[in-house]
């Protein structure tokens, strides 16, 4: 594995760890800075601000990386993330924490640039495997983050942010001296209209051959929000799980998913192609959602982990298919749009998921899982529009 890829993967890991470490300590942190008042509103604002900033700035950073190169945008994002962790570690005021989360949302948009960098340095036939590695690293980061937050937060509430700042600072300096540029900056005069976050979305809308795949991408984001949103609620009501079972089940799912993405995506893609791997993943994910709907014993909740893990091979294959249809000088813009759409799905889907879950559980508690499976089935006609990958440029 080359040095550049290691730096990019460490950036992805630190982003995932940073996103996860705040959740175990955020309620106590808000109680500390507010003096014990009602934290509900401030808690919601901090989560919403993060998601909105990520939605707005993902396409902006992606487009800027197409114009000026990936390296400077990544370095700027890493510096911003370091500043955010320091703000979160020492801020005595609630509104400053909100500003810190806004900054975190902006800098977390560097995932779009990291994905574009991987696309730049990876041959088309190996992209699914590389995106699978990225998914595995993210899964491990989301497991490690809450552990760091919970364990170190018990020692000192702010200490997880200092640890994250340390790792991020080290990554910044390693990237500064080791990370090469993956593409040259584009010629021409910079125009401020390039900072318009809606411009890449307009570009996507005008790029008709890409729309079916991007629609599938959004469906994936909506469906993936179901377990992420209701897993704890469902486990408690359906299986009677306590916090130990919750933590154990999340670890089992995270580790099995990471292993599948790290070790299965490459072989499956070589054997069946990206489209075949996508279909395999959708099949097993649909089977997993259907199985969860009918699971009524605790062990069944664990037994579906391999199905969800196999379902996880679909997203790297889909990312590879999407990148193969866009020219090299538009990969940053593409990844920015994809990240922005996933952020939007992350804002909307939890609201819809909880609404469906609570409105249907009195009829049948497993309904929400069948809704996820049904979304895959409704999207299946779009797969018929997907042909063999071809790189295509579009100036919009």
What annotation goes with each model-predicted range?
Residues 180-215, 238:
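Juxtamembrane intracellular "pre-TM" segments in multi-pass secondary transporters
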Residues 99-139:
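Cytoplasmic helix-loop-helix junction between adjacent transmembrane helices
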Residues 3, 172-178, 370-396:
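Multi-pass alpha-helical transporter architecture, strongest
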Residues 72-87, 165, 276-291:
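Structural signature of the two symmetry-related core transmembrane helices
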Residues 153-166, 355-376:
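A membrane-interface helix-boundary motif in multi-pass transporters
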Residues 25-40, 229-246:
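Short amphipathic helix-loop junctions that connect adjacent transmembrane helices
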Residues 275-318:
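C-terminal transmembrane helical hairpin of 12-TM major facilitator-type secondary transporters
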Residues 55-93:
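Conserved MFS/SLC helix-loop-helix module at the cytosolic interface between two early adjacent transmembrane helices
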């Amino acid at each position: 594995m080359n040095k550049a890829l290691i730096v990019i993967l460490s950036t992805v890991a630190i982003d995932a760890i940073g996103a996860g470490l705040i959740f175990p300590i955020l309620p106590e942190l808000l109680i500390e800075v507010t003096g014990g008042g009602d934290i509900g509103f401030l808690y919601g604002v901090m989560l919403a601000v993060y998601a909105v900033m990520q939605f707005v700035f993902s396409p902006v950073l992606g487009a800027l990386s197409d114009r000026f190169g990936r390296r400077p945008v990544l370095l700027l994002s890493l510096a911003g993330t370091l500043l955010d962790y320091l703000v979160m570690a020492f801020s005595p005021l609630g509104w400053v924490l909100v500003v810190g989360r806004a900054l975190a949302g902006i800098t977390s948009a560097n995932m779009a640039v990291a994905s574009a960098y991987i696309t730049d340095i990876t041959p088309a036939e190996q992209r699914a495997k590389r995106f699978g590695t990225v998914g595995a690293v993210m899964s491990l980061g989301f497991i490690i983050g809450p552990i760091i937050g919970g364990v170190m937060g018990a020692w000192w509430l702010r200490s997880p942010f200092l640890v994250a700042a340390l790792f991020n600072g080290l990554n910044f300096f390693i990237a500064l001296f080791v990370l090469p540029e993956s593409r040259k900056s584009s010629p021409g005069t910079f125009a401020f209209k390039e900072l318009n976050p809606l411009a890449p979305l307009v570009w996507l809308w005008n790029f008709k051959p890409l729309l079916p795949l991007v629609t599938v991408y959004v469906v994936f984001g909506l469906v993936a929000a179901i377990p992420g949103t209701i897993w704890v609620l469902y486990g408690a009501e359906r299986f009677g799980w306590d916090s130990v079972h919750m933590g154990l089940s999340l670890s089992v799912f995270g580790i099995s998913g990471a292993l599948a993405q790290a070790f299965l995506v490459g072989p499956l893609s070589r054997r069946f192609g990206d489209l075949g791997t996508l279909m395999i993943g959708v099949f097993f994910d649909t089977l997993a959602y259907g199985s969860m709907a009918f699971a009524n014993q605790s062990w069944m909740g664990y037994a579906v982990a391999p199905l969800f893990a196999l379902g996880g091979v679909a997203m790297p294959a889909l990312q590879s298919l999407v990148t193969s249809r866009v020219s090299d000088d538009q990969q940053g813009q593409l990844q920015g749009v994809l990240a922005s759409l996933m952020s939007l799905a992350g804002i909307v889907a939890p609201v819809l998921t909880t609404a469906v879950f609570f409105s249907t559980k009195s009829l049948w508690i497993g309904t929400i899982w069948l809704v996820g499976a049904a979304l895959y089935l409704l999207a299946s006609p779009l797969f018929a529009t997907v042909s063999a990958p071809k790189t295509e440029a579009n100036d919009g």
